[in-house]
């Protein structure tokens, strides 16, 4: 995922920062506990496509 793109993308709900999970190919919003998929290198920033992250499991902002 392009670092410049990550700098401009925000959560469509809260407008907060997103963190890239390289292993899962998702962009994570820790505030809303949502994970947005990346398909064929393209972030799918639709709320209907997002999945809930596991409650209480913090996502590493460094993408590790």
Curated annotation (Swiss-Prot):
Any single Gene Ontology cellular-component annotation: cytosol
Source superkingdom: Bacteria
PANTHER family assigned to the protein according to its UniProt record, in alphabetical order: PROTEIN PREY, MITOCHONDRIAL, ZGC:162634
HAMAP family given in the database record: UPF0434 (MF_01187)
Annotated family: Belongs to the UPF0434 family.
Name under which the protein is recorded: UPF0434 protein Bcep18194_A5877
